[in-house]
């Protein structure tokens, strides 16, 4: 009986040790930043001039800070909405939501802004 008890305790201890080892090292907490129809960003009513684009950048920074405050560690940033791009592409034109004109080049690179700002806060960026 004593031997069975010892084996049972050993098996229980081994199971506990293995389950602790199997736990993920961190949680994956993220949210989507949707650009199609300017649902989350950029503001479709912002002006297309340099001042309007500066407001777009400031608003994106506020969204990233909001992610940081909510203790999220990942952002899924939509970079393709309507066969256009939120980054410099040799295949697709710039999104009309950035400048008001499809293919109009903005004064900044939105994808690079998101990557730099999020990484500075320890937030991963995944594009879709």
Regions found by a protein language model. Name each.
Residues 22-23, 67:
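Structural motif
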Residues 23-48:
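Boundary/entry segment of secreted carbohydrate-active catalytic domains
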Residues 77-128:
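Aromatic-lined substrate-binding rim segments of carbohydrate-active enzymes
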Residues 8-19:
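Bacterial N-terminal signal peptides
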Residues 25-29, 71-73, 119-125:
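Short, well-ordered coil/turn segments that N-cap beta-strands
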Residues 50-58, 105-109:
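Soluble non-cytosolic domains of exported or imported proteins
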Residues 58-84:
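Catalytic domains of carbohydrate-active enzymes, especially glycoside hydrolases
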Residues 1-8:
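Bacterial N-terminal signal peptides that target proteins for export
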């Amino acid at each position: 009986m004593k031997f069975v008890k010892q084996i049972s305790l050993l098996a229980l201890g081994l199971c506990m040790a293995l389950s602790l080892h199997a736990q993920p090292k961190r949680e994956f907490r993220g949210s989507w930043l949707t650009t199609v129809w300017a649902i989350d960003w950029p503001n479709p009513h912002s002006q297309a001039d340099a001042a309007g684009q500066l407001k777009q950048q400031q608003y994106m920074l506020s969204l990233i800070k909001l992610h940081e405050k909510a203790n999220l560690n990942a952002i899924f940033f939509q970079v393709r909405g309507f066969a256009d791009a939120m980054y410099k592409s040799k295949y697709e034109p710039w999104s009309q939501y950035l400048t008001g004109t499809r293919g109009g080049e903005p004064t900044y690179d939105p994808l690079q802004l998101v990557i730099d700002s999020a990484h500075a806060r320890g937030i991963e960026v995944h594009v879709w």
